[in-house]
Swiss-Prot record:
UniProt keyword annotation of Secreted present: yes
Taxonomic superkingdom: Eukaryota
UniProt KW keywords: Amphibian defense peptide, Antimicrobial, Immunity, Innate immunity, Secreted
Tissue specificity field: Expressed by the skin glands.
Annotated protein name in UniProt: Dermaseptin-SP1
Family per similarity comment: Belongs to the frog skin active peptide (FSAP) family. Dermaseptin subfamily.
Function: Probable antimicrobial peptide which stimulates insulin-release in glucose-responsive BRIN-BD 11 cells.
Gene Ontology CC: one annotated term: extracellular region
The keyword Cell inner membrane belongs to this UniProt entry's keyword annotation: no
Locations listed in the record: Secreted
Length: 28
């Protein structure tokens, strides 16, 4: 289904954003 792919892409993007935020906090 199209909406499933849509949600999957949002999930991936959100996951990357969270991961980047955590990495930035750890590096500082």
């Amino acid at each position: 289904a199209v909406w499933k792919d849509f949600l999957k892409n949002i999930g991936k993007a959100a996951g990357k954003a969270v991961l980047n935020s955590v990495t930035d906090m750890v590096n500082e």
